[in-house]
Amino acid sequence: MANNRYQGTGRRKTSVARVTLVPGSGKFTINKKDISEYFNFDTLRVIAKEALELTNNAESYDVTVNVKGGGYTGQAGAIRHGVARALLEVDPDYRAELKRAGFLTRDPRKKERKKYGLKKARKSPQFSKR
């Protein structure tokens, strides 16, 4: 019996998404909710589905995601990263176009820490000449 489950882990900021692809009709479930119920904004839904759209697999796989940590934008990016990695398990030939689109690269940008003597990470207190 062939294994029809493909898994990938995606990360972005502080979010971690565990993605499972199963051949099906195109259902997209995030934390046991439908994608339209989980993400209120269309832009986030588009980001999450981008890798599937690029490889023309939007209607051929059911996607189940368990995501935690971070905010909605970070979670959408983590889901995209995880879906792209899972698609590589489906067919390694997708690597070139996924890499070109930048979906396989872990986005290293994180929140910069606040430094003492400053208001925020880089914002300094107002300077007074006299």
From Swiss-Prot:
Q: Does the keyword Ribonucleoprotein apply?
A: yes
Q: Where is the composition biased (Basic residues)?
A: 111-130
GO cellular component, as recorded:
cytosolic small ribosomal subunit
Q: Where is this region: Disordered?
A: 102-130
Q: Which GO terms describe its biological process?
A: translation
Taxonomic superkingdom: Bacteria
Q: Name one GO molecular function term.
A: RNA binding
| Protein keywords | Ribonucleoprotein, Ribosomal protein
What InterPro entries does the entry give?
Answer: Ribosomal_Su5_D2-typ_SF, Ribosomal_uS9, Ribosomal_uS9_bac/plastid, Ribosomal_uS9_CS, Ribsml_uS5_D2-typ_fold_subgr
Q: Which family does it belong to?
A: Belongs to the universal ribosomal protein uS9 family.
Recorded protein name is Small ribosomal subunit protein uS9
The protein's organism comes out as: Finegoldia magna (strain ATCC 29328 / DSM 20472 / WAL 2508) (Peptostreptococcus magnus)
Its lineage opens with:
Bacteria, Bacillati, Bacillota, Tissierellia, Tissierellales
